[in-house]
């Protein structure tokens, strides 16, 4: 992934991170946490259960020597965190992997202070697909463990049910094989192989090709 492209899309939403206490759920190797730090965040707690990603973070932070970012190798649902602790909570690229999307949204909401923000970034489908799609065999665009892919209206319905207020949203951006591509460090199958070779508006499974979108929500 060219992770900087996603970050630039977030920055267009003009959400101030200056002085904020942030929770980044499913943070990968911590790339976005370091970008948050660069935007003036005070403290960032990263939750990432994948130990390879945790190892990458530790290697990066060995050079960065930041005491403002901590990473814990746990899932949100397994943590006994104090609720209403964070000014901003991020969930990027997680919603479609949830067996219970409503619970995920509510678990995130519990971590946000009153008046704080929840940032959701996810794949969305066209509204004509209904509120959500349940992919056969839980596979979508060659990704395993994809249980629900929501439309824009489906996402907004989830947020309304959780009594979250939509304050801003990005445009929906189609994922390209320039943003997610093979490199000499990652020579395996990538996004290009996830699309129908005869119609790049469809996934290899025949579903609408993914677009990604940010939502800025307030508690």
Show which residues each predicted segment covers.
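A short glycine-rich, Lys/Arg-flanked "PGG" loop and its adjoining helix->strand segment in the class I
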Residues: 102-117
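A short SAM/SAH-binding and catalytic strip from SAM-dependent methyltransferases
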Residues: 87-101
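Short, glycine-/aromatic-enriched active-site segment of Class I SAM-dependent methyltransferases
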Residues: 123-146
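A short acidic, Gly/Pro-enriched loop at the edge of an enzyme's catalytic core
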Residues: 79-89
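Conserved catalytic loop of SAM-dependent methyltransferase domains
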Residues: 163-193
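Conserved class I S-adenosyl-L-methionine
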Residues: 20-28
């Amino acid at each position: 992934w060219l992770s900087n492209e996603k970050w630039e899309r977030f920055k267009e939403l003009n959400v101030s991170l200056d002085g904020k206490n942030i929770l980044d759920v499913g943070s990968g190797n911590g790339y976005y946490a370091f970008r948050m730090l660069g935007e003036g965040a005070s403290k960032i707690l990263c939750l990432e259960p994948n130990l390879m990603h945790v190892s990458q973070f530790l290697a990066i932070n060995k050079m960065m020597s930041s005491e403002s970012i901590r990473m814990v190798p746990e899932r949100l649902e397994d943590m006994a965190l104090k609720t209403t602790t964070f000014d901003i909570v991020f969930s990027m690229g997680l919603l479609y992997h949830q067996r219970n999307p409503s619970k995920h949204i509510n678990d995130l909401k519990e971590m946000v202070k009153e008046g704080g923000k929840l940032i959701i970034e996810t794949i969305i489908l066209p509204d004509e697909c209904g509120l959500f799609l349940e992919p056969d065999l839980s596979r979508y665009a060659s990704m395993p463990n994809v249980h629900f892919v929501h439309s824009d209206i489906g996402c907004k319905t989830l947020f309304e049910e959780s009594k979250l207020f939509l304050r801003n949203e990005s445009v929906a951006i189609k994922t390209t094989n320039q943003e997610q591509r093979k490199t000499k460090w990652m020579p395996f199958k990538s996004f290009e192989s996830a699309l129908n070779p005869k119609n790049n508006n469809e996934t290899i499974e025949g579903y609408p090709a993914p677009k990604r979108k940010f939502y800025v929500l307030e508690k």
